Design a protein with these regions (language model features):
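Structural motif
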Residues: 35-49
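Short Pro-Gly-centered beta-turn/loop motif in secreted/extracellular proteins
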Residues: 49, 74-82
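Hydrophobic beta-strand segments
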Residues: 52-56, 85, 123, 161, ...
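A short, solvent-exposed loop/turn motif at the edges and junctions
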Residues: 56-60, 84-97
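Short, acidic Ser/Thr/Gly-rich low-complexity loop/linker segments typical of extracellular
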Residues: 59-72
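Structured extracytoplasmic
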Residues: 82, 116, 126-299, 305-313, ...
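Conserved "repeat-terminator" motif of extracellular CCP/Sushi domains
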Residues: 107-117, 121-125
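Exposed, low-structure sequence patches enriched in small/polar residues
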Residues: 270-272, 401-854
Length: 854
């Protein structure tokens, strides 16, 4: 069906080019005619001013741009601007112009200098085209980059320091009149702590606050990476059923741990090229502004901005010492208004260094972010203070005996905090703790939080029990028809260590009940549910349910609502009776061990037949018993932990997984075998070109098994795109007893579209992928007269085999698509390149997924 539609579209494409050319001509013409442009100049020197923030509101939403290296700016249609345009630059008085004053293509806006605490510079940009050759600013930056190692603390053989972090999240774009309106009417007291954003003057009310005290140690003789020990932590518990570990990780991912000396800067779940990167000379434009004194040093003020303002880069300024060190004393990073980052209106990061013991060491980091999603504005701030630097290997050696988190680190009293804070709380920060205690007792607020958690986590809180997953309540397939399911689980309100979960489901076509019951005991203390990191969990489960053989879904099960939409009927299913005893253990360093003992009975459904080749044995059910051991190592892994599943957060470290399975006849199973599988996953950021996700996997079976116990390759017959599946492969289409697999998904992060004048306004991002698997079924496991006890591969009504091997060639599919459509949708067109003659093959098709990212 899909291929027929595609052929029709292909025929029509012959008529499209002329239409597109005409349409693009009129669009470009309209854009050019509608542009209102001008130049911003210094009122005293009359020099053009680069990197001035030019902001305005469109239907209440903040928009804007930044002047280029020659001080020029371009606005769109003035009719789309609500009222006024604001021109802002550090060290200058803000200028506000009504839109009627900016109608034209040669408007001059004059800005006046004001006194500034750092003796702010005068911009002396030149009008000529930017050049890297013979550019004093570029030559200075080459010296700064060359001295990075010399000036970085990482150059020391041993060091330690203390760190105090304060993180705050607030509701923004508020005013006093909202205090008496829904939804704030019952919590109006939070407006008593209203503050003003230093970025844009918007009012905000803090709702969340977190503090963390830690000590970092490094000794080159014993380790290649620093070690951080958390000594104290406390936060505003928004509610007990929010996973604080995941919340803190997610916020840390948003705000990042920025070091200007790093090659790449992690921020907002992306990686930006640092102005001090070895590639910065190619990515940024640099301009020398002036010299000034800062804390006893003569410094050179240096301005920088991305060569292309839609790229993932910063504009800002830095103070570089005017000596042989060429070290950074202070830096400010900003995102251009025209940046391609989603949901972020403005962001500013500042980092300061101080001279201590003859070294320049980081003393302060401060980051402020203004977010906006439809209907909600938020303000975030993270302030980090450093102190007590020591360069002594003996002190560092003593830290080896300390755990990553000292005992009772999250139970420190006020006296401890008052004594050990590097920087005291401000009155407003203390007020957040007080307001949080009052919020927890307000019923409308609690209902709101529970609703958000039901949407985000999939479960509805009912006290001691959570109902869900909501998404699995209704689904359908060819065997069961409409499937209704009711499930739930207990939480820590029921018992601090013992947890239960389960479900009951019923098919309106097969008239059959399915159910699952599971008991879990957590040896580790948990805040709300048993799956919180790290695991130390023993579980016993029994299940009777329909399954798709060989399909291990990355998140959820086959009865998720989205899995119901399939281009081909799902009729290759079994009814499984499964008893599982499992123990999961993982360390804070992200090394995990999973052991499992399982008894499985599989009954064929629909078109499946489990009769042997010689017709003498009917495996109904097919019995298998296994002992399984899985080792997994994911150094520095970061993830969001929902009630059951983990979603990785911007992991660049490799993930290694090794699984060994022993199928035994000990409990009356039909076959004995050994199965080994290894997997490696890795993400690479490719400068400003986006990132590449790669997974390599291989497996081999030793012994004789029927096709259900082979490696049945992960397919996807739905219309949703899955990163970890072959999206045009049918269920049960290919099986192997030895194979190697490669999957590569690439995101350009808008690198191409950002250079196309009209497309860059849409903030679309290009994606592509290539996936391949090559394997075979050995003669020992091939159903034939030589193996009469094996089960033949399934066939269709015409007698054609619906399951085959990959002996002839690899299975290969590729895709290309557009991500970030409306900031939430990704569309990919997938092409299948091999085995096109197999039954029910779809050669190409459009797939979608919901993908929300910064």
């Amino acid at each position: 069906m899909e291929s027929t539609t595609h052929i029709t579209i292909q025929d029509k494409r012959r008529k499209l080019p002329s239409f597109l050319v005409i349409a693009l001509f009129f669009l470009c013409s309209a854009a050019c005619l509608a542009q209102n442009a001008g130049c911003v100049i210094d009122g005293k020197t009359k020099e053009p001013m680069p990197f001035v923030n030019v902001s305005y509101h469109t239907k209440g939403r903040l928009n804007g741009t930044t002047t280029d290296a020659n001080g020029n700016y371009v606005l769109g249609l003035l009719s789309q601007i609500d009222d006024s345009v604001v021109f802002q630059c550090v060290g200058y008085t803000t200028v506000t112009k009504h839109k009627s004053e900016l109608n034209g293509s040669d408007i001059i806006v004059t800005m006046q200098q004001k006194s500034f605490e750092l003796n702010e510079f005068t911009v002396k940009a030149r009008r000529e085209h930017y050049r890297r050759k013979n550019n004093p600013a570029v030559e200075l930056m080459r010296k700064v980059i060359a001295n990075k190692q010399r000036n970085s603390i990482e150059n020391a053989d041993a060091y330690s320091y203390r760190k105090h972090e304060k993180m705050e999240v607030s509701l923004s774009n508020l005013n006093e009149s909202m205090r008496y309106k829904a939804p704030f009417k019952k919590i109006g007291f939070i407006f008593d702590n209203m503050q003003e954003s230093e970025l844009n003057g918007k009012k905000y009310v803090p709702l969340y606050f977190m503090e963390n005290l830690s000590e970092t140690y490094f000794d080159r003789s014993s380790s290649s990476t620093p070690r951080t020990i958390t000594t104290a932590n406390r936060d505003v518990e928004v509610d007990k059923f929010l996973d604080q570990y995941s919340l803190e990780l997610a916020m840390d991912e948003v705000f990042g741990d920025i070091d200007i000396y790093d090659e790449r800067i992690p921020l907002l779940s992306n990686e930006f090229i640092s102005p001090l990167s070895q590639y910065g000379i190619l990515f940024y434009h640099y301009h020398i502004a002036d010299t000034f004194y800062f804390d006893g040093d003569t410094c050179i003020s240096l301005l920088f901005s991305p060569a292309n303002q839609q790229d993932f880069g910063f504009y800002g300024k830095m103070a570089v010492t005017k000596d042989s060190l060429c070290a950074v004393r202070k830096v400010q990073l900003n995102l251009p208004y025209s940046n391609s980052v989603n949901f972020v209106e403005q962001i500013r990061f500042e980092q300061e260094y101080q001279r201590r013991d003859g070294r320049l060491l980081v003393a302060l980091k401060n980051i402020v972010v203004d977010f906006h999603v439809p209907g909600v504005s938020a303000h975030g701030r993270k302030r980090t203070i450093y102190d007590d630097y020591v360069f002594d290997s003996i002190i560092v050696a003593k830290s080896r005996k300390l755990p990553d988190h000292v005992p009772n680190y999250n139970k420190r009293d006020d006296d401890y905090w008052n004594e050990h804070r590097i920087e005291p709380l401000t009155p407003n920060e203390q007020r957040i703790y007080d307001d949080a205690a009052r919020l927890s007792g307000v019923t409308p607020y609690r209902v709101l939080v529970k609703t958000i958690m039901a949407v985000a986590g999939g479960y509805v809180d009912l006290g001691k029990v959570d109902w869900g997953p909501v998404e699995n309540t209704v689904s359908w397939n060819s065997v069961e028809g409409v499937r209704l399911r009711l499930g739930g689980k207990t939480n820590m309100n029921f018992n601090e260590h013992l947890f239960f979960s389960g479900f009951v489901a019923y098919g309106l076509k097969d008239y059959r009940f399915k159910y699952n019951i599971k008991a879990m005991y957590s040896f580790a203390e948990k805040k709300y549910h048993q799956y919180e990191f790290p695991h130390n969990l023993l579980s016993l489960a029994y299940e009777e349910n329909t399954t798709i053989p060989g399909q291990e879904f990355m998140m959820g099960t086959s009865d998720r609502l989205f899995q119901s939409f399939s281009h081909t009927g799902i009729d290759k299913m079994t009814f499984d009776r499964k008893l599982t005893l499992q123990y999961d253990y993982e360390t804070p360093r992200h090394f995990s061990i999973k052991t499992k003992v399982e008894h499985l009975e599989q009954e064929p459904l629909a078109d499946l037949d489990f009769t042997s080749v010689d017709g003498k044995t009917e495996y109904n059910p097919l019995r298998s018993d296994i002992f399984e051991l899985q080792l997994r190592f994911a150094p520095r892994e970061r993830f969001y932990q929902s009630y059951e599943y983990r979603m990785p957060i911007n992991n660049t470290s490799p993930v290694y997984t090794l699984t060994y399975t022993y199928g035994t006849r000990l409990f009356g199973a039909d076959f004995e075998y050994h199965k080994l599988k290894a997997r490696l996953q890795k993400r690479w950021f490719v400068l400003s070109l986006g990132f590449l996700d790669v997974s390599v996997e291989a497996g081999k079976i030793f012994g004789q098994v029927p096709h259900l116990l082979l490696f049945v390759h992960h397919a996807n017959q739905g219309y949703t795109y899955q990163d970890e599946a072959f999206n045009l492969m049918n269920y049960f289409e290919f099986a192997s007893d030895q194979y190697v697999q490669l999957m590569a998904n690439y995101s350009f992060n808008g690198f191409i579209f950002n250079r196309i004048p009209l497309l860059k306004k849409l903030k679309w991002r290009e994606v592509c992928s290539a996936k391949a698997v090559w394997g075979d079924v050995s003669s020992l496991n091939m159903p034939s007269a030589d193996n009469p006890k094996l089960i033949p591969f399934p066939t269709n009504a015409d007698g054609e085999p619906e399951t085959s091997t990959l002996a002839k060639m690899p299975y290969v599919e590729v895709s290309a698509g557009i991500d970030n459509i409306f900031k939430l949708l990704c569309l990919e067109y997938v092409w299948r390149l091999t085995y096109l003659d197999n039954p029910n093959t779809i050669p190409h098709g459009l797939r979608f997924r919901v993908h929300i990212a910064f």
